[in-house]
Structure formats: C-alpha cells, structure tokens
Design a protein with these regions (language model features):
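Cyclin-like alpha-helical protein-protein interaction core
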Residues: 115-118
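Helix-coil boundary and N-terminal low-complexity module in membrane systems
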Residues: 1-113, 124-128, 132-224
C-alpha cells in the first residue's frame, strides 16, 4: 500500500499533473475574466506547465504567479494588442460574414477569406508570443518579429498547434466544464513542440545555462 502513495508512482505523478492542470486552468480563467490580464495569464500558464509540470521544477502554483509578476508588462502589452485585434475581427469581419454564419446565406468569398486569415494570424501570434515571453528576455519589437519568424520557419509545428487549439476550443464550446482542465492541458501539450523550437534557436552557451535549476529566462537583450 505504501508504494501506491509513493511520489514516484506513475499513477500518483499523473494525478499530480492533472491536479496542476486544473489549478492553473482555474487561475487562468479567473484572470482572463478581467480581460486586462489575458496576456500575463497566458504567459504564466505556459511557464507553469513547462517549468513545473513538464520539467518538474518547483510547483505549478508558485511558478504561475512568479511568471505572472515577472512578465506582466510585456505580456500585458501583447494581451491588449491581441484583444483589440480580436475585437476588430468581431465587429468588422464577423459583421461582414453575418448572413453566411448565422442565416445560411451564400458566403462572400473575399470576406470569408479575410475572416479566416485574420483568425489564423491571431491564433498564431497567441501561440508563439506568450511562450517566447516566458522563455526569453527581449525587447517588445523583437518578441513580435521572432514569434512571426518562428511560426513560419516551423510551419508543421505551427499547423499542429493550430489544429490542437481549434479542437480544444471546439471541445470547450461543446462541453463547457472542460474549461477547468483544457487550458492547462493544451499549454502542457504545447510545450513539446514549443520547447523544441525555442531550444533549437539557443546557442550552446544558452543550453548549458538552461540546464541550471535557477536559470530559466535567457537574456537576449543584454547579450547583444
């Protein structure tokens, strides 16, 4: 019986990870309800899933709040930027496609293309910007450019993450109670392609530094 409750027991480890996903998902939801904190919360949940759940450094709760505070302003900027972009899509592109989306009318080809294109760009930026902020200390313009370049350079991984994101979104709409676990679960799955992508663009010196328990953020700004 004692071995069943051993921390190294696989079942216990899985349950601990599931609990971390539920806790961080709930924190993410509550913070996103403020709208203003969407960016900082998104950076924090990725950081917590990568550092605490996948790499098992510290606790997910502790790392979530550490990242939330440490990356607040840059994440706030991009969170508000993407929120404004999303609102513009709603009022401009959704309105232009209203009859097609809600009244079964024939679609306007260009209007529909514009809607799909903008939604995909919004999703891609969201997928890359916040993990980059969680990993690298760099100026805001470089975060934006690096996120776009990484999404293009690693197109297959980008497509994979987009598909998983839209599946998660559809599942949440269909089964709303999943909102208490899917944000964390998605962020955890996202760490597998994203960590591989970001580590591929680190120098050998960066990789050595990254192996340290206390070293996590890579200060690109001060190295140049």
């Amino acid at each position: 019986m004692s071995s069943f409750f051993d921390y190294n027991n696989k079942f216990i480890q899985i349950m601990n990870k599931a609990a971390d996903m539920m806790i961080t998902s709930t924190m993410w939801i509550l913070l996103c309800l403020t709208v203003v904190c969407i960016g900082p919360a998104s950076t924090a949940i990725y950081h917590a899933m990568a550092k605490a759940v996948r790499y098992e450094r510290e606790s997910a709760f502790k790392e979530f709040w550490r990242s939330f505070k440490q990356n607040f302003w840059k994440s706030l900027f991009f969170g508000l930027l993407l929120t404004v972009f999303a609102v513009s899509i709603y009022f401009v592109d959704i309105t232009a496609n209203y009859d097609f989306l809600f009244n079964n009318a024939a679609p306007d080809g260009w209007a529909l293309f514009g809607l799909i294109f903008k939604v995909v760009v919004l999703a891609i930026l969201g997928l890359y910007v916040f993990p980059v902020i969680s990993r690298f200390n760099m100026p805001i313009p470089r975060i934006f450019v690096s996120s776009l370049l990484l999404s293009i350079r690693h197109l297959l991984s980008t497509v994979f993450m987009l598909v998983v994101l839209f599946i998660a979104g559809y599942a949440t709409i269909s089964y709303p109670y999943l909102v208490f676990v899917l944000p964390g679960a998605f962020a955890f799955l996202q760490t597998f392609p994203m960590e591989k992508i970001m580590r591929a663009h680190m120098t050998e010196e960066d990789r050595v530094e990254d192996e340290s328990v206390d070293q996590w953020y890579l200060d690109i700004e001060n190295k140049e």
